[in-house]
Amino acid sequence: AYRRQRQMCIRDRRYRSPGGKLQGSSSNQRELREHPELALDYVTAPPRMALYMEYSRRIYATYLKYIAPEDIHVYSIDEVFLDVTSYLKTYGLTSEELARKMIQQVLHETGITATAGIGTNLYLAKIAMDIMAKHVEPDEDGVRIAKLNERSYREQLWNHRPLTDFWRVGRGYAKKLEENGLYTMGDIARCSAGSAQEFYNEELLYRLFGVNAELLIDHAWGWEPCTMEAIKNYKPSSNSVGSGQVLQCPYSYEKAGLIVREMTELLVLDLVDKDLVTNQIVLTVGYDIENLKQSEFQKNYRGEIKTDRYGRKIPKHAHGTMNLEEYTSSTRKIVDATVELYQRIVDPQLLVRRISLAANHVIQECEIAETDSYEQMDLFTDYQAKEEQKQREKEERERERSMQQAVLELKKKFGKNAVLKGMNLQEGATTIERNRQIGGHKA
C-alpha cells in the first residue's frame, strides 16, 4: 500500500513538473513545495535506542530543575507524569504557562519539542495529550498543549470514537463493549447510571469486565482515584523478570527450542546480576499463521484455533508454568526446568513465531530464609551419604555462581558478545543480534 501510494505521488509530481520530467529529489517538505521538479524522496533512519535514552535522561534532568523527583513519574522513554499542583503558586504561573516554560527549556537544551496534556487528574492529563493535543495547532516552536477537566472531558469526548483512543481501552475491551451496544465513553457512563430494572446498568459492566469495570466506569466519568503519591508508595506483591521476542521468520520446533535455551540463559544472568532468585518459570509460545495455510495440515489439526487482531486464523498459543523445588539462580536448574516445560507444552508439528519467558516470584537472594529443616529418621537411609550429597551440591552452586559472576564481569568490561556459547553460533540463534539491541531495538 505504501509503495503504491509513493508511486502515485511520483506520477502526480511528474505531471506538475516543468516538461513533465523530474530532476533531483528531496525529502524536505518546503523544498518539495517550492520546487515541483524534485522527486519525492525519504530518509531511512534506523532506531538508535542508546541515543534516545541519553536524550530522555537529559530531558528528565531539565524537568528536575522545576519539579522534585517525588512529583515525577516516568511513564515511558518519552513520556512523564508531573504533579505541578503545589508549584503553581511558587512560580506564579498557570499550569499552561509552566508546561510551556518547561517545554521551551527542553527545546533550548536538546532541540526537541513536546506535546503536553493538562488535567485535573492523571487520567485527564493523559487523555488531553493523547487525544486533544494532537489536534491543537502548534505554536512557532511546535508545542501543542491541551487541557481537560471533568466537565470539559464529558462535553468534548463523551461522543469520541473509536474507544481504543482512550487510555487502557484495547481492542478486546472495545469489541466486547460494542457487542453490547456501548460505543463511546458517554455510553459507558450512562450505562453505569442505569437502574437495576434496566438492561444498561452498572451490573452489566461488572459481568463483562469483573473488578476492572470499576476503573472503566471511573474513566468514563473522567475520574481517576490514583494519585502521584499512590504511585510512589506502590509496592507490588509479586515481582517478575522476563523477556520476549518476535522471531523474524517461522521457526521449527527444534530451532525454537534453541531460542528458548538462549533466552533462559540470558534471563538467569540477569537474575544473578541483580542478586535475585526465583522459584517459578512461565513460558508462552505463539505459533505462526503459516501453520494453517496448508490445507492438508489444517484438515488434520485438532488443536484450538484463535483469530488474531488482524482477523487471521492461528493455532492457540502454548502457555505453561514450572515450579522449582527452591529459590535459585542456577543456570543448570532453570534451563533444565524451562526445556522440560517447553517440551511439555509446545506442539512439535507447529511453526513458532513468538516466545515470552518470565521468572516469577523473584526476591533478593539475601531474603531466602535460612531455616533448620527436620525430617523423620529411619533405619534404611544413609544420612552420612545424604549429608555428603548436600555438601557437594552446595560446592557445585558456589562454583557455578563464580562462573556466572566471571561471565558478567567480562560482558560488562568487553561487551555483551565477549562471551558466547557454541549454541549462539548455530543457524537461527538470536543472542548475538539481541545483545546489540536495547529493548528489542538497535542500540
Locate each region found by the language model.
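A glycine-rich phosphate-binding loop feature that marks nucleotide/adenosyl-phosphate handling sites
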Residues: T120-Y123, D218-W221, V277-I289, L351-Q364, ...
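Alpha-helix boundary/capping detector
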Residues: K89, M132-A133, G242, G286, ...
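Gly/Gly-Pro- and Ser/Thr-rich, intrinsically disordered tail segments characteristic of DNA damage-repair
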Residues: R4-Q7, R11-M228, Q384-A443
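Residue-level signal for secondary-structure boundary sites
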Residues: T90, L124, N291-K293, E365-E367
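Acidic, metal-coordinating catalytic segment for phosphate/diphosphate chemistry
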Residues: G311-A443
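DNA-contacting surface of Y-family translesion DNA polymerases
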Residues: A39, D165, Y173-V352, T371-D372
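Nucleotide/phosphate-binding catalytic cleft detector across ATP-hydrolyzing
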Residues: A1
